[in-house]
Amino acid sequence: QKLQENGLVKIVPYKGTTVTRLNRRIVDELIYERTAVEARVLRDFSPRCTPEQRALIRRRVEAYEALAVMEIPDYNKLYEADRALHGTWFAAMDKMYLWSTLQNAHADYSRFRMLDTMTTGGLAEVIADHRNLMNAIERCDLAAFEPLVERHLYGGIRRLGSKLTEEYADYFEPEK
């Protein structure tokens, strides 16, 4: 019942339970929202970033990298390491309500991220994105944040490309 309340499954009494399809429009809107909010948080955070916070970010980037290069990556640990890294600047700016809202916004976005992570082999690109964000923070390059965050968060759509409408079309609700 809880899965149905969260939109993950559809239960038809006496017939069965099916996993719900992803809503591509919602995924796109959530990425758009997170891009706008996270870029702003980073612009506010970067000038205030302390040496201790920079060291924490570096450790978290390196922790993600260590998980990503394992022979058989643990995708749940990668997901949590990614959340910890991005949560760093939200926590530093005392914007944890925003972070929590973005993380819990809709199950479709989390499921889409897992589809990307588990099927595209795009971990090297994610590592490069994290390094670029870390370097922009260290340089306090305020103009870099929006394009970097946009590239990073839209990466799944870019990596999956035509597979979204071909190989994984059945994972998504039909376009209306």
Identify the function of each model-found stretch.
Residues 25, 51-115, 126-139, 144-158:
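Conserved amphipathic alpha-helical segments that form helical-bundle/coiled-coil interaction surfaces
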